[in-house]
From Swiss-Prot:
A lipid is attached at residue 116 (Phosphatidylethanolamine amidated glycine). The C-terminal 2 residues are removed to expose Gly-116 at the C-terminus. The C-terminal Gly is then amidated with phosphatidylethanolamine by an activating system similar to that for ubiquitin. Residues 117-118 form a propeptide. Disulfide bonds: none annotated. This is Autophagy-related protein 8. The record marks 116-117 as: Cleavage. Belongs to the ATG8 family. The gene is ATG8. It is a lipid-anchor. The lineage of its organism: Eukaryota, Fungi, Dikarya, Ascomycota, Saccharomycotina. It comes from Candida glabrata (strain ATCC 2001 / BCRC 20586 / JCM 3761 / NBRC 0622 / NRRL Y-65 / CBS 138) (Yeast). GO terms for biological process: autophagy of mitochondrion; cytoplasm to vacuole targeting by the Cvt pathway; endoplasmic reticulum to Golgi vesicle-mediated transport; lipid droplet formation; membrane fusion; piecemeal microautophagy of the nucleus; protein localization to phagophore assembly site; protein targeting to vacuole involved in autophagy. CDD domains: Ubl_ATG8 (cd16128). Ubiquitin-like modifier involved in autophagosome formation. With ATG4, mediates the delivery of the autophagosomes to the vacuole via the microtubule cytoskeleton. Required for selective autophagic degradation of the nucleus (nucleophagy) as well as for mitophagy which contributes to regulate mitochondrial quantity and quality by eliminating the mitochondria to a basal level to fulfill cellular energy requirements and preventing excess ROS production. Participates also in membrane fusion events that take place in the early secretory pathway. GO terms for molecular function: phosphatidylethanolamine binding; protein tag activity. It is found in: Cytoplasmic vesicle, Autophagosome membrane; Vacuole membrane.
């Protein structure tokens, strides 16, 4: 999944920004969160997040759910490098395993209707 953030900003600018963020906020992780292309789920109002290192993937999913005002009958799935990270994983662990060369962690979210409602 190609990130629109990556296509909008050159590598050098992204790397410089992530380094600046990491120096200023050492216990935070720079995350770019974007909706999957073909998903029918709402678009999130912002895509750059600075999350606490001890936040779990499940807690991050909750933050995204709230920001897009997703109804309870809709599911949301978070992908990092096209894989579903375990809900109990710490964002710092996911970051160490999957961070991009530019220093950001790229997360894609998608949804599907779990109960068949329209």
């Amino acid at each position: 999944m190609k990130s629109s953030f990556k296509s909008e900003y050159p590598f050098e600018k992204r790397k410089a920004e992530s380094e600046r963020i990491s120096e200023k906020f050492q216990n935070r992780i720079p995350v770019i969160c974007e909706k999957a292309e073909k998903s029918d789920i709402p678009e999130v109002d912002k895509r750059k997040y600075l999350v606490p290192a001890d936040l779990t993937v499940g807690q991050f999913v909750y933050v995204i759910r709230k920001r897009i005002m997703l109804p309870p009958e809709k599911a949301i799935f978070i992908f990092v490098n096209d894989t579903l990270p375990p809900t109990a994983s710490l964002m710092s662990q996911v970051y160490q395993e999957h961070k991009d060369k530019d220093g950001f962690l790229y997360v894609t979210y998608s949804g599907e209707n779990t109960f068949g409602y329209q």
